[in-house]
Regions:
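Helical membrane-embedded segments and adjacent short helical loop/helix-boundary regions
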Residues: 2-18, 31-37, 42-45, 152-173, ...
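Membrane-embedded alpha-helical modules
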Residues: 118-203, 210
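Intrinsically disordered, low-complexity non-transmembrane regions of multi-pass membrane transporters
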Residues: 1-4, 117-118, 216-224
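Pore-lining transmembrane helices
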Residues: 6-99, 117
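Helix-loop-helix junctions within the multi-pass membrane cores of secondary transporters/permeases
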Residues: 66-157
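Membrane-interface elements of multi-pass transporters and channels
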Residues: 28-29, 86-90, 147-152, 194, ...
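Alpha-helical transmembrane segments and their membrane-interface exit regions
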Residues: 44-48, 71-78, 162-168, 188-190, ...
Length: 224
């Protein structure tokens, strides 16, 4: 096992643990266990999944939930462009698999490696590690939800916010992400009393996407 593979598997397990919260909260939001697991297996991007169930659980429409999840998942397209040069797919099936596994963690582990072979190993170890553990722990959380009882009685009604913050926190190491996060939070709070459930988080996603697009030229210059 190479250093990149060890790093990828460690990241996979640590990230996968959040799946327990997702599974339990998905069921509490109105999904059944199979739907929760399917969402993890098919959508497979934590931020988008928590946004989806947050909107659904708050009474928002499926369209608003899907819109919020989609906007939060746009960043994976940018990752894909970067990884296409670092870890180019060798076949059509591999390209499809890499598209599914292109997330924050697999990209971070791949980019952190200096050796080209290690970049590929790191990507696959992190991508597959997160996928397996995320889906497995999502299933565990969905099944365990029936045994947990009322979420508010255990103080778990804020678990979605805490889990989402946990996913976001590692990305707030620079000034720009912090400013964007604060601005998105302000927009969300301002919209809560004024618009139907589900739309505030969609508004925050629009703000984040617009800010990312506005900073795109500078980002491209810094990575070239």
């Amino acid at each position: 096992v190479t250093p990149a593979q060890r790093a990828g598997l460690s990241v996979g397990f640590a990230t996968g643990l959040y799946g327990i919260s997702f599974g339990a909260l998905a069921v509490a939001s109105g999904l059944d266990a199979w739907q929760a697991v399917a969402l993890s297996a098919l959508m497979f991007t934590g931020g988008s999944q928590f946004a989806f169930i947050g909107v659904v659980g708050g009474g928002g429409s499926p369209a608003a939930a899907t819109g919020a999840a989609t906007l939060l998942g746009v960043r994976n397209t940018v990752y894909g462009l970067r990884l296409a040069t670092l870890v180019p797919p060798r076949s059509a099936p591999e390209r499809a698999a890499m598209a599914q596994l292109t997330i924050d963690e697999s990209t971070a582990v791949a980019v952190a490696q200096q050796d080209r072979a290690e970049q590929r190993r790191g990507f696959w170890a992190a991508g597959l590690g997160v996928y397996v553990f995320w889906v497995a722990f999502s299933a565990l959380g969905a099944v365990a939800d029936d045994r947990i009882g009322e979420l508010d009685a255990l103080g778990l009604d804020g678990a979605a916010v805490a889990a989402f913050t946990g996913l976001l926190w590692p990305h707030l190491s620079a000034r720009r992400p912090v400013v964007i996060a604060v601005l998105a939070a302000v927009v969300t709070l301002a919209l809560v009393p004024a618009v139907p459930a589900g739309l505030p988080i969609l508004g925050a996603a629009v703000v984040a996407a617009a800010a990312g697009w506005a900073s795109r030229p500078e980002t491209l210059r810094s990575t070239s």
